[in-house]
């Protein structure tokens, strides 16, 4: 990877973060109706995920081009976790406020904080990314002493698993204890967020275990299957909600779930790439980055249709804006998988 390309792949997450922050703030400031007070903060805090993805990108790229320092090893994960905490605090503040739509908005923003924490954990697991090509070329399948210890690898996987478990419990509580349509909306979105967090377990586990050299051939299908299943669950529930509540104002949440499914499938590109190149040559590895490009386009095309629909049905206002933000997330994931492909290439 040359210096110019390394700058480009680090600029993409920052550009997408700037888009989310600016667009979210614009939506929020342009009115006081519930739709804007919901879509604005959600799109804004999607920027936190982009920042955490930037930290992952910078961590890997600096190792590839030889500019990784001891300070960077701690700085980038710390930035990711800081944005995660700030997002969670903001979500809690919104829940406690009394503005229109605060219940849904606050819970969703908290969920975005959970995703940001998972991505920050992926950045942490990437601090020894440079060992993956070496371990992949080792035919003895032995553990690399320079990689993570068993305890460190297990801790990273535990952290992201615990965050995913929190998201699932949060989702269940919203469904079970909720009495308002808003609880159905918030619970459904949290379901999709839990699917994304669970998908990130596969990414963190793949990176951490390959960096340690303990990744097995059996895990290739295991982690890939987990991510694809999570995306499918979110997609199917999204379709069910769209048609089950067709004449109700809350069926818009189905489109949000479809967007979260597309994010899961974007994450799958990284998990698939790591699986395909482990102790194997995969000539089509440089084609895998097409996956998040396609999911980003799908988000944007769906958002375009919903923008038109919003002129006739107000319930389409929120998903149209949120899907635009999801498109930014998917495009950011394109830069990450491209970096992974470059860093693991045997050329």
Region spans (language model):
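Short, Lys/Arg-rich N-terminal segment immediately upstream of the first membrane anchor
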Residues: 1-8, 143-151, 217-218, 283-285
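Short, charged juxtamembrane terminal tails flanking transmembrane helices
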Residues: 1-3, 135-139, 340-347
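Membrane-interfacial, low-structure loops and terminal tails that flank and connect transmembrane helices
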Residues: 132-148, 215, 280
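Short juxtamembrane and helix-loop transition motifs at transmembrane-helix boundaries
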Residues: 2, 66-72, 211-220
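Alpha-helical transmembrane segments and immediately adjacent membrane-interfacial amphipathic helices
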Residues: 6-29, 40-63, 75-97, 103-131, ...
């Amino acid at each position: 990877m040359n210096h110019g390309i390394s700058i480009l792949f680090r600029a993409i997450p920052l550009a997408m973060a700037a888009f989310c922050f600016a667009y979210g703030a614009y939506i929020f400031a342009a009115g006081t109706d519930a739709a804007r007070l919901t879509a604005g903060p959600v799109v804004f805090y999607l920027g936190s995920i982009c920042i955490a993805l930037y930290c992952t990108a910078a961590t890997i790229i600096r190792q590839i081009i030889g500019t990784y320092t001891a300070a960077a090893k701690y700085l980038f994960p710390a930035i990711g976790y800081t944005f995660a905490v700030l997002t969670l605090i903001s979500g809690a503040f919104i829940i406690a406020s009394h503005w229109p739509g605060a219940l849904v908005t606050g819970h969703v923003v908290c969920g975005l904080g959970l995703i940001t924490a998972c991505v920050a954990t992926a950045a942490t697991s990437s601090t020894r990314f440079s060992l993956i090509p070496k371990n992949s070329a080792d035919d003895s399948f032995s553990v690399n002493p320079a990689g993570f210890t068993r305890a460190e690898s297990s801790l990273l996987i535990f952290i992201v698993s615990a965050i995913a478990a929190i998201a699932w419990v949060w989702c269940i509580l919203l469904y079970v204890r909720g009495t308002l349509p808003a609880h159905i909306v918030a619970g459904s979105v949290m379901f999709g967020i839990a699917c994304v967090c669970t998908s990130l377990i596969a990414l963190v586990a793949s990176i951490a275990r390959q960096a340690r050299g303990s990744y097995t051939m059996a895990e290739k299908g295991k982690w890939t299957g987990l991510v694809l299943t999570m995306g499918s669950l979110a997609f199917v529930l999204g379709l069910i909600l769209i048609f089950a509540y067709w004449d109700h104002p809350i069926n818009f949440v189905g489109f949000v779930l479809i967007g979260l499914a597309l994010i899961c499938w974007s994450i799958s590109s990284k998990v698939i790439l790591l699986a395909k190149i482990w102790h194997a040559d995969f000539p089509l590895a440089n084609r895998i980055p097409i996956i998040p490009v396609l999911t980003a386009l799908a988000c944007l095309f769906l958002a375009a249709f919903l923008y038109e629909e919003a002129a006739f049905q107000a319930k389409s206002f929120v998903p149209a804006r949120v899907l635009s933000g999801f498109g930014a997330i998917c495009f950011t994931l394109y830069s990450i998988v491209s970096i992974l492909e470059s860093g693991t290439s045997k050329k």
